[in-house]
Swiss-Prot record:
It is found in: Cytoplasm. This is Shikimate kinase. It catalyses: shikimate + ATP = 3-phosphoshikimate + ADP + H(+). Pfam families: SKI. ATP binds at residues 12-17, 116. Catalyzes the specific phosphorylation of the 3-hydroxyl group of shikimic acid using ATP as a cosubstrate. Monomer. It comes from the Bacteria. Binds 1 Mg(2+) ion per subunit. Pathway: Metabolic intermediate biosynthesis; chorismate biosynthesis; chorismate from D-erythrose 4-phosphate and phosphoenolpyruvate: step 5/7. It comes from Clostridium beijerinckii (strain ATCC 51743 / NCIMB 8052). Its main location: cytoplasm. The gene is aroK. Keywords: Amino-acid biosynthesis, Aromatic amino acid biosynthesis, ATP-binding, Cytoplasm, Kinase, Magnesium, Metal-binding, Nucleotide-binding, Transferase.
Length: 169
């Protein structure tokens, strides 16, 4: 049985916030993949992107391989982790993948583009990424959770899904 949960979804959909809350309630290790990559490389995500998106994606793939070896954990992935099939194949072996599906209108209203290299172009870029990735998120997910209500309700729903589907005790 799988012993990790990986949250996927658009930048700003709530992966890290929800992941932290779920991990605190279940007392399971939380790992933010972007922070993991920054610690691994001693560079920020924007600094890695200065060398090109593929340069960053190579480190993201390496992080997926390393995190697949972790014990019990809640992992918040980067928004583009689904762009490489190998990443999802690696993560699916030991992880239950949850797509945090947040309505586009809410993403457009909340996302801080200054800290997200791929979103520097603003609203149009968010819409384009959403259109490119939405179906990938749906196809990769073991479970889809809609983030369009009170966060406590979302956390409770995810806890139920985890306790029903994973070996986390």
């Amino acid at each position: 049985m799988k012993n990790k949960v990986v949250f996927i979804g658009m930048p700003g959909c709530g992966k890290s916030t929800i992941g932290r809350l779920v991990s605190e309630e279940l007392k399971i290790n939380f790992i933010d993949m972007d922070n993991y990559i920054e610690n691994m490389t001693s560079k920020t995500i924007p600094e890695l992107f200065e060398h090109g998106e593929n340069y960053f994606r190579d480190f993201e793939s390496l992080a997926c391989r390393e995190l697949a070896k972790e014990g019990k954990a809640i992992i918040s992935s980067g928004g583009g982790v689904v762009k490489r099939k190998e990443n999802i194949d690696i993560l699916k072996e030991e992880s239950f993948i949850i797509f945090i599906d947040r309505p586009l209108e809410e993403l457009l209203g909340d996302v801080d583009i200054s800290k997200r290299p791929l979103l520097k172009e603003g609203r149009e870029k968010i819409i384009k990424l959403y259109e490119e990735r939405y179906e990938l998120y749906r196809l990769c997910a073991d479970k889809i959770i809609r983030n369009d209500r009170e966060i406590g309700n979302i956390v409770n729903e995810i806890k139920e899904v985890i306790l029903d589907n994973l070996e986390m005790n």
